[in-house]
Every structure is written in C-alpha cells, then in structure tokens.
C-alpha cells in the first residue's frame, strides 16, 4: 500500500511502555520476548518467499506482528499461528492475496519440514483454518483497522538519491532497513524517516564512507527529518549493534565462515568465505566506539544544494588488535553477514531444518533468494569467478565503483589464492598477413571446387530427369500421377507450374485397365477440330483443366515416347515455367496446399534440386526465349490439357473426393506467352456427383477460344508440328 505521511502516534511507544508489554507482565523476559519477535519475523520471511509475495508484503506482515504483541502476550497467542495470520492479512492489503489453503500448507511445511504435506480433509487442517480466520478478525480489531504501513525503505531510497550516494552504499542502507524490522523494535519506537537515517548512518560506518555537508551547510539527515540529530543517530546505531551482539548463535555462524575460509577453491570457483580481512576487520570502529563522522570542509561542493558523491575514507589504515577483534567480528558477522564486500552465499549457512526454527536470529539465507525488484540482496553466488582481479557482483546487486573493486581485491588477497588467470583459449590467435591471405585463398578454392561439382551434378541429373519421367508402365500397373502442392490447376504462370516439377507429389492410384484407351487419332482430332464445333465441349474441357489437378496420364507418356523431339522442348518449358511461377508468386497470389496423404517421390526430389540450381539462369534469360520455346511450350500445354481431360472423363469414378472450387477472382491464364483473361463467376457451381466434379455451366464462364486455337494452329504450322 502507498503509505501516507503522518502515521498515528498510538503505534509509537516509549521505552517504559516497551518494558511493560503484556508478555513482560506474563513473566516473559525482555531478551526472550525479543527472541520471539525475531523468530516470528523469520517465519514470516520464510513463508512469504515460499508463497512468492513481495518483500513489501513481508515487511508489512512483520509490522502487523510487532504491533499485535504490543497488546497481546506471546503466552496467549502462539507466534506460529500469528505469523501466518499476519502474512495472510498483509497479502490482502498489498493486493497480493493468497489462498487460505496455501497459507496453511506453507506454514505447516515451514514449521514441520520432515512431516508429510498437510491433508485438507484432516482435522488438523480444519482446526488451523478456523483458528486463522478467527485470528484475522482479532488482529484487525487489535490494529484498529489501521492497515496502511509506512516503511523506512522509501526514505532510504530518496535520501541516497538526494546525496548521490554510490550504489553500494544505497544497497547496504536498504539492507539495514530490512534488518531493523527483523531484529529490532525500531518500528514501534521511531518514525520511518528516523529509521532511514539510522540505516544510512550505520551503512556509512559499515562501508567506511562519508557523506559531506551540502552547500547550504546542512547535514544530509536534516533533509530527511529535521528532528534527527547526530547524537540520536549515534545512540540508535549503538543500540542496533547491542541487539546484534545479543543475537544467539553468532559464534557458531562465524566459526562456519572461518571453516569455509580454509577450504581451497575447486574448479575455478570463488571460495564462499566473506572477506573478513577486508570488510569486517577494517570496520571494527563500529564495535569499539560510535563516534560522529566529521565533515570535510575542504571537499569541493557543487553549485546546487544537492550532495556530491561520497568519498572513501582512509580505507585499510585502521589497525585492530586480535584479542578484541575476534569477539567484535562475531557480533557484526552474525547480525549482518552479507555486507557490500561480502561474497558469501546462502550455502554457507546451517542447512539443518531444526536450527532454522530454534535459533531466534533471523536466518540470512532467506534474504539471498528474494526478488531483485522488491528486496536488494547482498550475497554472492558461489559460481562467480574473478577476472582481472575484480569482484563481479550478480545481476541483483549493482556493480562496485572501480576504486572499491581494487580495494576489495587488495584487502582480500590473503583469503584468495590470487586472481584466477584467464582461460588460454579465450584469447584470439594472431596471424600474419601472408598466412591470412594463404588461408583465404584455400577457402576460396574449396568453395569454387564445390560449386563446380554441384553444377555438374545438377546438369547431369537434369539430363536424366525426363528420361526417367517418360518410362512407360504396363496397363495393369498403378498409374503415377503428379499432384502439385497448390490448388491452382490452370496452365498459367503460377506457383502450380513451379511446384509441378519441383515439389510434385507422386500418388499411386491402382485402377483397373481401361477397355479401350484413347487412340492417338482421337487426340489429334481434339486439337485439330474447328472451334465452332467444339465451343461447348471446350468450355467443359477448360473447366476440367482449370479445376482439376494437372495429372500426367499414361497417354501423355506414350505421346512423349513417339515424339522424342518434345524431350528437348520440355526442358525449355520447365525452365520457363519456373521463371514464370516465381514472378507470379511475387505478385501476391497465395498458393493453397492440396492435402494428400502421400510423400515426395525420389524423382520429385531430384528434379526439385536441379530446378533450384537452374533458377537464376532461367530468370536471367526469361525475356529472351525463342519462338521454338514458345511453340513447344504451347504444344506441350495443349496436349497435356487435352490428355488430362480425356483421362479424367474416362476414369472419373476413381476420384471420389472433389477438389474445392477456385476463389472468385480474376486470373491471368497463360499458355507460354499466349494469355487470355479469364473471369470466374462469383458463385461457382458446386458439383453434386462424380461426373459433375469437372463440369460447370457454360454461362458462368466466357472465353473466346477461336483466336486462341487459330494462333495455336498457326504456331504449330510454322514449326512443322502440325498433326
């Protein structure tokens, strides 16, 4: 929730009130009560991460818990049921509501990790459901329905931006603000602006940085909260450190860190030890005494009232005695193990599930897995490598400044085995100019040789392709028909003509032998007949040839046998069909796939490869074909159309599935370079029978065949192809 300034003062308590809480009146000691609060916050953090809610929701739930126990005792309300209630309510308030069932299951998994999942039908689940719903009402009444919470994180971000603090300092301050909620009761004593100033002040001492005064002569905290003084900051910082000192299990954790420091690095990984010698030892001033940071009057101030970037103090010059430093470092490391210089990861923490519940300290390993948008982590993964002596941080944490990176590497040289050398294979190999030219020449020679071989192979296959296509079959064997991948069946410059040769499907349809096949005399008569006598039948034939697949029938193959001269013309025809089909595709005619449950044949694949090889040459010579190519193309198209019509009329009962009618648009039908404009009717006649699949009304189409047949006849006569 967006927090409005001016929270109710009824939720800020004095020290006397904190010493007289309901838990204290019930006989709970102050340290024990603080331990209960820390463990409750730890449980809320763990549950929030498993429920995948934002860190803002988790922080709000922790504040609910702190305020609730200012009016109720830990002896009457167990923290293990109040924590799920607070998170359940906070998720609703922050608009990240989670199901009650999920909250109860996650709470059970966190509290009892070794037990099986909770069954929703068992009595324990039903009892927890009733308790949580009842406690939610009690919590709302206790809070007085003041559910909007102000957090210090907002003021921390604003102040660090105001003073132009480094990313490292801003992240450390943000981390301290979260720790103040988990480990202290500052949210019950001070306003969020005061807590933000304390966190920034503590982060400055922790990171050994200084924020100078502004051009107006004011300290940075005066811009955040005018009531804050340096004495108050020092006092609260000292109190924060005392709370960290009382945090249990700190020595156990520091011993684990020191044990990890003695382990050698394996497989180029960075050791998971925090740099105690660089960050903790040199920041021991936090424990010895809390003193104010003197202003630097000699620092060049900018012209505006904003603060310049913080400057580092004399880092590395502080000397610490070993007798006292070990205990003090234990205090600091236990409370705030993941500082800006730390490269520790969550694997170094104790992984025992029981210890996570019994230790009252907030488990830091949970903060390492938070999302970067809600919570800024300060832990480094174990797989991050060191290159060029610089510590690279993960993506969640911003990069250090170059000065701090060098300082970290120098100070941590005792913990690491020196910078890891770069991989030998990473550097590019240097090559002289002569060697480069020789290598380039060899590569070019190989490419030319390969292209020459492929061109020769394609030409050879192109020569043998028609020979395989005209191979005859017996009358009783299945007929090989080539079905194009598109439904455009008109003999025009279309994709179907391109696919007929390159991407045709070979469909084997076993049919009974015909009683009497069409003779060559009949085929000749179909071409030589006068247009006046053939007007209606040619209309029907054109509909068949346009609305049926261009099958290559057995008669057409026999015609190719008897006219070997067509073999030479067919090669020109296929080249021209390729160039025409590609040009028509560029005009925007979308081809429709003819669905047939067959695959490509070997002849189709070889012809497709050869056609692709010859595509560029055919496109270059597209406009320079001779009359022989035109006439042969026209003759081949006419004979193919007539033979297909004859075949379909004699065996129309085989094809039980009609092809879809063409779309009602205007097409350019071309026989070679002879083109006639054909306008299809907007409502094509739908076939209703096996014979009607290829027959349409003559009134739906209009075409002047007389000129076309006269031109065909004259061309055939000119070439000596007159039959």
UniProtKB/Swiss-Prot annotation:
There is a cross-link at residue 404 (Glycyl lysine isopeptide (Lys-Gly) (interchain with G-Cter in SUMO2)). GO terms for molecular function: 7SK snRNA binding; chromatin binding; cyclin-dependent protein serine/threonine kinase regulator activity; RNA polymerase binding; transcription coactivator binding. It is found in: Cytoplasm, Perinuclear region; Nucleus. Residues 297-325, 340-364, 385-428, 458-645 are annotated as: Disordered. Residues 1-298 are annotated as: Interaction with MDFIC and MDFI. GO terms for biological process: cell division; early viral transcription; late viral transcription; positive regulation of transcription by RNA polymerase II; positive regulation of transcription elongation by RNA polymerase II; regulation of muscle cell differentiation; skeletal muscle tissue development. Transmembrane segments: none annotated. GO terms for cellular component: cyclin/CDK positive transcription elongation factor complex; nucleus; perinuclear region of cytoplasm. Signal peptide: none annotated. InterPro entries: Cyclin-like_dom, Cyclin-like_sf, Cyclin/Ssn8, CYCLIN_CCNT2_rpt1, CYCLIN_CCNT2_rpt2, Cyclin_N. Residues 250-298 are annotated as: Interaction with POLR2A. Belongs to the cyclin family. Cyclin C subfamily. Interacts with CDK9 to form P-TEFb. Interacts with POLR2A (via the C-terminal domain (CTD)); mediates transcriptional activity. Interacts with HEXIM1; mediates formation of a tripartite complex with KPNA2. Interacts with HEXIM2. Interacts with PKN1; enhances MYOD1-dependent transcription. P-TEFB complex interacts with RB1; promotes phosphorylation of RB1. P-TEFB complex interacts with MYOD1; promotes the transcriptional activity of MYOD1 through its CDK9-mediated phosphorylation. Interacts with MDFI and MDFIC. This is Cyclin-T2. It comes from Mus musculus. The lineage of its organism: Eukaryota, Metazoa, Chordata, Craniata, Vertebrata.
């Amino acid at each position: 929730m967006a927090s409005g300034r001016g929270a109710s003062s009824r939720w800020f308590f004095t020290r006397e009130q904190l010493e007289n809480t309901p838990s204290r009146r019930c006989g709970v000691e102050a340290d024990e009560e603080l331990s209960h609060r820390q463990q409750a916050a730890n449980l809320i953090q763990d549950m929030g991460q498993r429920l995948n809610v934002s860190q803002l929701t988790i922080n709000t739930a922790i504040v609910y818990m702190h305020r609730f126990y200012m009016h109720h005792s830990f002896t009457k309300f167990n923290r293990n049921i109040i924590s799920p209630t607070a998170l359940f309510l906070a998720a609703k308030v922050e608009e990240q509501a989670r199901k009650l069932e999920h909250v109860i299951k996650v709470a059970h998994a966190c509290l009892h990790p070794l037990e099986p999942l909770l069954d929703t039908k068992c009595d324990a689940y039903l009892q927890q459901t009733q308790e949580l719903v009842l406690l939610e009402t009690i919590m709302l009444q206790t809070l007085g329905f003041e559910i909007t919470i102000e957090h210090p994180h907002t003021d921390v971000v604003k102040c660090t931006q105001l003073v132009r603090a480094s990313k490292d300092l801003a992240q450390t301050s943000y981390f301290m603000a979260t720790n103040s909620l988990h480990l202290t009761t500052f949210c019950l004593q001070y306003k969020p602006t005061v807590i933000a100033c304390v966190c920034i002040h503590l982060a400055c001492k922790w990171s050994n940085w200084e924020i100078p005064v502004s051009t107006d002569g004011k300290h940075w905290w005066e811009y955040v909260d005018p009531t804050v003084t340096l004495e108050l900051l020092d006092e609260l910082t000292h109190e924060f450190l005392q709370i960290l000192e009382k945090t249990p299990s700190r020595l156990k954790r520091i011993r684990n860190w020191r044990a990890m420091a003695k382990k050698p690095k394996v497989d180029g990984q960075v050791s998971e030890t925090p740099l105690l010698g660089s960050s903790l030892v040199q920041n021991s001033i936090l424990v010895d005494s809390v003193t104010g940071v003197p202003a630097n009057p000699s620092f060049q101030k900018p012209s505006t009232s904003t603060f310049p970037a913080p400057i580092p103090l004399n880092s590395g010059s502080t000397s610490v005695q070993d007798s006292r430093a070990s205990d003090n470092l234990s205090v600091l490391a236990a409370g705030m193990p993941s500082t800006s210089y730390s490269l520790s990861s969550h694997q170094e923490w104790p992984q025992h599930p029981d210890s996570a519940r019994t230790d009252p300290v907030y488990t830091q390993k949970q903060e390492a897995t938070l999302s970067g948008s809600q919570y800024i982590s300060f832990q480094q993964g174990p797989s991050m490598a060191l290159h060029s002596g610089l510590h690279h941080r993960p993506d969640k944490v911003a990069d250090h400044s170059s000065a701090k990176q060098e300082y970290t590497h120098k100070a941590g040289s005792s913990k690491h085995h020196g910078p890891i050398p770069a991989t030998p294979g990473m550097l590019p190999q240097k090559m002289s100019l002569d060697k480069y030219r020789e290598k380039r020449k060899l590569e070019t020679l190989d490419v030319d040789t390969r292209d020459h071989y492929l061109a020769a192979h394609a030409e050879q296959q192109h020569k043998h392709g028609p020979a395989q296509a005209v191979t005859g079959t017996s009358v009783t064997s299945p007929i090989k028909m080539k079905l194009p991948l598109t439904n455009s069946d008109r003999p025009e410059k279309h994709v179907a003509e391109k696919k007929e040769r390159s991407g045709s499907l070979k469909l084997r349809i076993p049919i009974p032998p015909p009683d009497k096949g069409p003779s060559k005399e009949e085929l000749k008569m179909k071409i030589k007949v006068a247009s006046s006598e053939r007007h209606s039948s040619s209309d029907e034939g054109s509909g068949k040839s346009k609305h049926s697949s261009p099958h290559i029938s057995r008669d057409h193959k026999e015609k190719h046998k008897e006219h070997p001269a067509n073999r030479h013309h067919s090669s020109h025809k296929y080249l021209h069909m390729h160039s025409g089909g590609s040009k028509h595709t560029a005009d925007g005619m979308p081809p429709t796939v003819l669905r047939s449950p067959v695959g490509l044949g070997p002849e189709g694949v070889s012809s497709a490869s050869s056609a692709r090889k010859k595509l560029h040459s055919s496109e270059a010579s597209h406009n320079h074909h001779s009359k022989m190519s035109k006439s042969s193309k026209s003759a081949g198209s006419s004979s193919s159309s007539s033979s297909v019509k004859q075949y379909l009329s004699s065996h129309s009962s085989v094809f039980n599935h009609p092809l879809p009618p063409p779309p009602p648009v205007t097409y350019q039908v071309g026989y070679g370079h002879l083109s006639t404009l054909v306008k299809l009717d907007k409502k094509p006649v739908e076939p209703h029978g096996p014979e009607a699949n290829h027959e349409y009304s003559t009134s739906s189409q209009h075409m002047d065949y007389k000129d076309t047949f006269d031109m065909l006849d004259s061309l055939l006569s000119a070439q000596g192809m007159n039959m």
